[in-house]
């Protein structure tokens, strides 16, 4: 039975299915028979959170322990948030409907910098104090992990525990320490000291930060005995030890990505200098084709999904991809399951690949060119040429495709207006290629979509040292791009430059931003990643009122020897390598994929040996 307050709220909101739970695949346990209760919180709407593969992996993993129960919670949309505040209904989990305060640990995934105010909103709805220092032993442990943990300093003061790296070993180890602490009755301080011994775990309270007079970080030092000066990320050396989930919670309300999804590999060999994920998840590791095929078949059978996505940063780099597709095509067409590869690369796309992914249904193809000129592609180490783009599009058009989306970035280091014009010229050349191709789909026109993101300088990349373009400069470049497109066959989409600016501030920010985030939330800022909710002027006024210049964080160059807010976080990539790649970028020199030759980035030390067997061609 629903709580009467919840029942009343559900009758007054759109999409009440976001909040009811009871979805197929949900896991239920008896509360009095579990030792650890963990609430996995996604700081965005149900539809966004239910698309996140990481939650599905950890949900199944934690619940595989009989005496632990992992449940889910999401950020309620505006109408439900207002109803919960009006009715004084605390934020609850989907499974038990218990408030977050009933849990031993509340974990947030940090996928996007503009979700930070949503984290505060969820804590606020739960009645949990924002700052770790204000929570004693009576409160749940507040935990975070995910890609933004690589520099979580702007929100570090809110969390008791932050996980760096991959959570398959970390999170169960944390839960084991919580279980032990409950049985032994130890204090929160001692629990945190115990958790700090787990590889890849960062306890912000155990580090002090000092600053130079000009605002730059001076030093980050441990304040407890035995705490490491640098925290090295956790890594799964062999992905085959962790089979992909074979059952998902199937959402009541359509998720943004409502399909079966299998992670085929982790990491990337390419070394695109702007791509944070490519550096955070090094080195690349892949699962065996036989394991993936069985997991995929079981997952589709258990969930009823009719679309299967082979997910990764660069799926076409899997060394057994053709073999895997052959195995999948033995059963997928019979079950009316279509296959999708969301991360195809122009330089290893083939006729064979396209044939094996269109057995059931064709959809548009998406490729990342990233820059409009070869010079700028060399700067960012996007080793793609026009000849490869032409070859790929020809294969696609011969196969009957009439829709191509091209991803680009704007505001890249050394970019000029000539590079912006190159984006439009590349799209026009693709349009022309379609109509010159006598094998294109008869009676149908082509649609080429330019999707243009704003470059954001991110930690742990060679471009962490460079400033971002101002919002005004980005807007001028967007205007120039629109003026450079002269065909109705080309559609242009681009990101809002002001949200990208705020993303850049938090990406490279420090602990002095925490009060700004709290104050902005109190002034009505949340769902900052949603265009209709973003309050840029409120953010800028909040920065001004608190005496902080946001441009200091993202629109000034960082000296190559500067201590950064993330200097104490070790993701396996050496500082020397990042500097070397930065200098090569300025000289427009490229670096080959690391499976062809080791580029000495340092990630091999995480594995205790070479990342690849260089005696054989893996790609």
Residue ranges and their predicted role:
Residues 38-44, 62, 248-276, 300, ...:
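N-terminal pre-triad scaffold of radical SAM enzymes
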Residues 55, 87, 123, 157-162, ...:
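Short secondary-structure boundary/capping segments
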Residues 78-79, 154, 208-212, 319, ...:
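Flexible glycine/acidic-rich beta-alpha junction loops that bind and position SAM and/or redox cofactors
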Residues 75-222, 459-510, 518-532:
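Glycine-rich beta-alpha loop elements in corrinoid/cobalamin-binding modules
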Residues 7-39, 46-47, 204, 210, ...:
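N-terminal [4Fe-4S]-dependent radical SAM core
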Residues 1-27, 38-40, 486-619:
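Radical SAM enzyme core and accessory elements
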Residues 40-41, 105, 114, 298-405, ...:
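Conserved SAM/AdoMet-binding glycine-rich loop
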């Amino acid at each position: 039975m629903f709580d009467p307050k919840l029942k009343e709220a559900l009758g007054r909101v759109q999409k009440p299915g976001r909040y009811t739970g009871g979805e197929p695949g949900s896991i239920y346990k008896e509360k009095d028979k579990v030792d650890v209760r963990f609430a996995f919180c996604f700081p965005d709407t149900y539809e966004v959170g239910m698309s996140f593969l990481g939650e599905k992996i950890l949900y199944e993993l934690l619940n595989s322990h009989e005496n632990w129960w992992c449940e889910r919670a999401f950020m309620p949309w505006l109408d439900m948030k207002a109803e919960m505040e009006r009715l004084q209904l605390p934020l609850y989990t989907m499974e038990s409907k218990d408030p977050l305060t009933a849990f031993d640990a509340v974990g947030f995934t940090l996928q996007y910098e503009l979700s930070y105010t949503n984290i505060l909103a969820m804590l606020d709805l739960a009645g949990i104090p924002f700052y770790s220092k204000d929570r004693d032993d009576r409160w749940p442990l507040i935990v975070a992990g995910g890609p933004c943990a690589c520099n979580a300093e702007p929100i570090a003061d809110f969390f008791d525990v932050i996980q760096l790296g991959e959570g398959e070993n970390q999170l169960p180890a944390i839960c084991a320490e919580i279980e032990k602490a409950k049985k032994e009755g130890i204090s929160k301080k001692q629990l945190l000291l115990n958790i700090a011994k787990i590889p890849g775990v960062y306890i912000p309270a155990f580090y002090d930060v000092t600053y130079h007079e000009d605002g730059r970080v001076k030093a980050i030092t441990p304040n407890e005995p035995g705490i490491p000066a640098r925290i090295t990320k956790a890594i799964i050396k062999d992905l085959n030890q962790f089979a992909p989930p074979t059952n998902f919670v199937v959402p009541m309300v359509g998720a943004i990505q409502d399909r079966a999804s299998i992670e085929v590999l982790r990491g990337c060999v390419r070394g695109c200098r702007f791509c944070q994920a490519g550096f955070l998840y090094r080195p690349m590791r892949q699962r065996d084709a036989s394991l993936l095929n069985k997991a995929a078949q079981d997952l589709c059978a258990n969930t009823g999904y009719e679309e299967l996505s082979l997910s990764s940063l660069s799926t076409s780099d899997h060394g057994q991809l053709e073999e895997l597709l052959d195995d999948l095509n033995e059963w997928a067409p019979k079950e009316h399951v279509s296959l999708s590869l969301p991360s195809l690369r122009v330089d290893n796309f083939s006729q064979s690949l396209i044939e094996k992914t269109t057995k059931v249904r064709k959809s548009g193809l998406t490729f990342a060119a990233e820059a409009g000129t070869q010079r700028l592609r060399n700067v960012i180490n996007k080793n793609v040429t026009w000849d490869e783009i032409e070859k790929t599009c020809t294969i696609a058009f011969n196969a009957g495709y009439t829709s191509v989306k091209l991803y680009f970035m704007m505001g890249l280091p050394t970019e000029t207006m000539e590079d912006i014009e190159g984006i439009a010229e590349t799209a026009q050349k693709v349009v022309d290629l379609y109509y010159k191709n006598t094998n294109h789909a008869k009676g149908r026109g082509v649609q080429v979509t330019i999707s243009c993101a704003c470059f954001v300088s991110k930690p742990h990349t060679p471009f962490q040292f460079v400033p971002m373009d101002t919002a005004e400069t980005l807007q001028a470049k967007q205007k120039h791009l629109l003026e450079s497109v002269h065909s109705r066959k080309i559609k242009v989409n681009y990101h809002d430059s002001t949200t990208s600016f705020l993303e850049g501030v938090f990406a490279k920010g420090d602990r002095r931003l925490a009060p700004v985030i709290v104050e902005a939330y109190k002034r009505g800022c949340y769902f900052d990643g949603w265009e209709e909710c973003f309050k840029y002027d409120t953010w800028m006024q909040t920065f001004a009122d608190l005496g902080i210049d946001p441009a200091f964080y993202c629109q000034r160059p960082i000296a190559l020897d500067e201590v950064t807010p993330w200097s104490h976080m070790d993701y396996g990539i050496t500082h020397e390598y990042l500097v070397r790649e930065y200098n090569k970028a300025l000289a427009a020199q490229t670096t080959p994929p690391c499976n062809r030759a080791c580029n000495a980035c340092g990630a091999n030390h995480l594995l205790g040996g070479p990342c690849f067997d260089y005696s054989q061609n893996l790609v």
